[in-house]
Amino acid sequence: MEAENSEVAALVEKFTGFHAAISKLPSLSPSPQVDALFTELVAACVPSSPVDVTKLGPEAQEMRQDLIRLCSTAEGLLEAHYSDMLTALDSPLDHLGRLPYFDNYINLSKLENDLLAGHMAAPARVAFIGSGPLPFSSLFLATYHLPDTRFDNYDRCSVANGRAMKVGAADVRSRMPFHTAEVADLTSELGAYDVVFLAALVGMTSEEKANTIAHLGKHMADGAVLVARSAHGARAFLYPVVELDDIGRGGFQVLAVHHPAGDEVFNSFIVAQKVKI
């Protein structure tokens, strides 16, 4: 136990250092300095760790919450940068490999599709909430795994949607409309979907996550499936954690939980089904 506590303390100290360094950056837009620092930060999250961020003290919790905010801003700027770069090219899909962590998006979409396929037939309609300016998740699922499925993408930022709708082949874009909306404003629309994906950065705190899941549970159709991106171990310094208890309280039954292993960089995710009340 003492060794574990020492390891957690060392990890908190390391991420406190990252937080301090990132906070001093004049801009979070992609640059050699920003890219190098965030590459180092992500690498520090990959090894398995005994840390449970819910048990950290108030000072560490405050640092972690601000680090998540900074990472969210940087991720949005990174996606916007690469979205603009790709759509300036004649064939954007031929150049997707330029994006950092491209392989991780490929692997994540395959894992999520495989888990879904184990619990349901191919969905007719899917919603992706928090699609962002570079909607790789829905793009890869629509292109490589679910060629007959309609993907409705929701983001609260109209500028992000404007960028996103330019990415992808024309036949795929025809099945991927984009809507500008806050998740809290989606009600009757949610009942039309067989699957709803909830992006990792929709809801930046545990309370916001819980409220979002409760809202989805209230309006999704009985039997529909929720795929919620989460975080585990040291990755929880970069992304909010979805608590399984909140999934249950939201009216869902957990079907599967996947935590990345080895050198996988992507998020954890939870697959759950709306229970008829």
Label every PLM stretch briefly:
Residues 39-121:
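Conserved Class I S-adenosyl-L-methionine-dependent methyltransferase catalytic core
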Residues 133-148:
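Conserved SAM-binding loop of SAM-dependent methyltransferases across substrates and taxa
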Residues 150-155:
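Conserved SAM-binding motif I beta-strand of class I
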Residues 163-192:
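S-adenosyl-L-methionine
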Residues 183-184, 192-209:
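A short SAM/SAH-binding and catalytic strip from SAM-dependent methyltransferases
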Residues 210-225:
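A short glycine-rich, Lys/Arg-flanked "PGG" loop and its adjoining helix->strand segment in the class I
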Residues 223-233:
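Conserved beta-strand signature within the Rossmann-like core of class I S-adenosyl-L-methionine
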Residues 256-277:
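Core SAM-dependent methyltransferase catalytic element
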